[in-house]
């Protein structure tokens, strides 16, 4: 919708024709009141060159798709939804080497660092000498996946999506990794250096 608001030509590709039908008849009209007839829907990759390609598939498929786009030089800008890949970082080294050699501008969907409140916080920190030395940074991402499943009622729960599987890039850590991104962003902004040690407490609950 954001792309159409800018009056860009938009093509949605999904190898599953049923997903495209669901997008046209249910998802888009429910969110934006009616379907936009100027949006193209395709189920076969046409290998055309685009100004912008957005990868919005499950995280465990991101790098494979992105590598193909980089190899074929299919766009000017490649936007990959977060998280960039799965927690095991499998294939990330090869991907980053391709990015360095490519003319394609590659970005990831951590957009919270560009919000008005983030800019305001940085402005206040820069101008207010009363804050003093920064001792700790705490980042919260108070979000619940209930909204996601409300928008995808054909899913019976997390188990039917990557969201319920952390190895596939789901789970609370990956799905809500905006908080990690904000933490690192402010750490760099305050010249506090890179993360050296990571410690986490996780409680797993198995439900029958």
Model-derived features: positions:
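A structural signal for isolated positions on well-ordered beta-strands in alpha/beta enzyme cores
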Residues: 9-11, 107, 138
């Amino acid at each position: 919708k954001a792309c159409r608001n800018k009056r860009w030509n938009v093509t949605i590709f999904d190898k599953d024709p049923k997903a495209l039908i669901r997008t046209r008849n249910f998802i888009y009209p429910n969110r934006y009141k009616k379907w936009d007839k100027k949006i193209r829907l395709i189920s076969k990759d046409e290998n055309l060159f685009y100004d912008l390609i957005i990868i919005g598939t499950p995280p465990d498929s991101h790098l494979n798709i992105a590598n193909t786009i980089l190899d074929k030089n299919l766009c000017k800008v490649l936007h990959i939804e977060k998280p960039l890949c799965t927690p095991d970082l499998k294939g990330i080294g090869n991907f980053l080497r391709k990015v360095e050699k490519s003319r394609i501008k590659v970005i990831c969907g951590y957009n919270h660092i560009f919000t008005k409140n983030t800019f305001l916080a940085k402005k206040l920190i820069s101008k207010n000498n009363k804050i003093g030395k920064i001792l700790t940074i705490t980042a919260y991402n108070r979000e619940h996946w209930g909204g996601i499943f409300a928008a995808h009622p054909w899913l019976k729960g997390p188990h039917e999506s990557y969201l319920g599987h952390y190895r596939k890039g789901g789970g609370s850590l990956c799905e809500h990794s905006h908080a990690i991104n904000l933490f690192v962003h402010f750490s760099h902004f305050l010249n506090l250096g890179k993360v050296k040690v990571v410690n986490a407490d996780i409680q797993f609950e198995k439900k029958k």
